[in-house]
Amino acid sequence: EEMENDSAKAVVTAYTVNRQKTSAEGSYTIYSLSDEKPEKDMFGADRYKINKLVTVGTFITGYEISPAVFRELPAGRYRLEVKSTDSNGKEVSANQDFILYNRQDKRPPVFMHTWLVNEHTTCAPGEEAAFIFGTSDKDTHILYEIYTADNKCTERKLIRLSDENRT
């Protein structure tokens, strides 16, 4: 998941084994992750290595983790790990990887062949679309096309990018 660091939000939700919402309190840890080629977990999903611990705190389900926590972090790949205790006193944990970016970044926040942030892509006639497109690759040629709702191409352009973002 990608989040802009100025507006990033996280709310922890807990469920029982029967998938019923429950309340919980616990701790969270945020780690920065390595940009190296990831390993695969047992389900085949990418699993990035932890680079270092960057912050810790506490949470109560249903309440936001302070947005200031995310604003203070530089653009990059992170893992949020939450821990709590269930009704039987057993420790439970979950984690979620995410990417923080800043709209003013000159290049993608992590190595990516295709970096796309949709800011405003469904528009009324005369309204401007806004998105950020980038690549970590060097000397790339990108063909972009803009279509109307009835599939008519209104613009086609070839642009060159080299480890950069464009708005």
What is the predicted role of each segment?
Residues 1-167:
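C-terminal segments of large proteins
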